[in-house]
UniProtKB/Swiss-Prot annotation:
Name of this protein: Ras-related and estrogen-regulated growth inhibitor
Lineage, highest ranks first: Eukaryota, Metazoa, Chordata, Craniata, Vertebrata
Keywords attached to this entry: Cytoplasm, GTP-binding, Hydrolase, Nucleotide-binding, Proto-oncogene
Main enzyme class: hydrolase
Protein residues bound to GTP: 13-20, 60-64, 118-121
Organism of this sequence: Bos taurus
Amino acid sequence: MAKSAEVKLAIFGRAGVGKSALVVRFLTKRFIWEYDPTLESTYRHQATIDDEVVTMEILDTAGQEDTIQREGHMRWGEGFVLVYDITDRGSFEEVLPLKNILDEIKKPKNVTLILVGNKADLDHSRQVSTEEGEKLATELACAFYECSACTGEGNITEIFYELCREVRRRRMVQGKTRRRSSTTHVKQAINKMLTKISS
């Protein structure tokens, strides 16, 4: 059997936005009512995405990490889900600063991420409009989803699958760039040698 591709995904957002519930809904198709929001967990999950077996390592961050922990998680991850709660404007306002930290830690690479507005079942308490989420996603140059980990509303599976696809696309582009770059170096070295020989 062919070896599966491995992808490291990390979930970030303020404590209480439903990061753990989102991950558990994706993995088990169930909603958990009680859990410790201060716990950090890592899950391994295998899925077939576009006819290819992919092993996801998913880091569910606690949302209360200190700076050193958070930066370590950001270095570890290849793809990121930035989650906010549509009923909590403060959690939405924390997304852009999080993205800026990610950019700083990951540079010069572009960050692969998806923006998620969770708790879409609580539309009556909404503080962040869908349009605001879409506008921020455009600024961040990423896909945007609204969903509910509680009811399963929105395509939660697609969030994780699309992030895996995007990570794998970026890997392929970076691999081609590296190959082109090394080919250029070889050509330059040969040209230098030929110049020396002919002079």
